[in-house]
Amino acid sequence: MATTNDAPTSLVGKTFDCSFGQFVPRLTVLSPTELRVQATIGATEIDEVVQSNLTGVRPGLFIMNWTEQGGNFVVQVQDHDNKVVHNYARLADGQVFCVQGAIQAVQT
């Protein structure tokens, strides 16, 4: 289990896999305002650094949002204590992608 508190800086430097079935994006928190997103969607590979907003709600619970270079806008509620992530995305083509999955710290 990741050791976190409600300060966004507690996630800085940490990497997490968000498991949504076969779709498993990897997120690395570079700062409270910068995030590295790595994912494979079909034949498309994403590896980009994006501007993000990270807010602590309570110890172990965070809300994070970012816009990917392709135009997808993503909001996540990350519950690190219970290892659950809720993902809400407005895709660039207008579709909405809402899913719940597991979040797991990755040792790098």
Locations of the language-model features?
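Contiguous, well-ordered beta-strand patches that form the walls/edges
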Residues: A43-Q78
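Tryptophan-anchored aromatic micro-motifs
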Residues: A2-V24
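Beta-sheet ligand-binding and adhesion/scaffold domains
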Residues: N65-T108
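Short beta-strand segments that buttress and anchor functional surface loops
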Residues: T15-G21, V37-I41, I63-E68, N87-R90
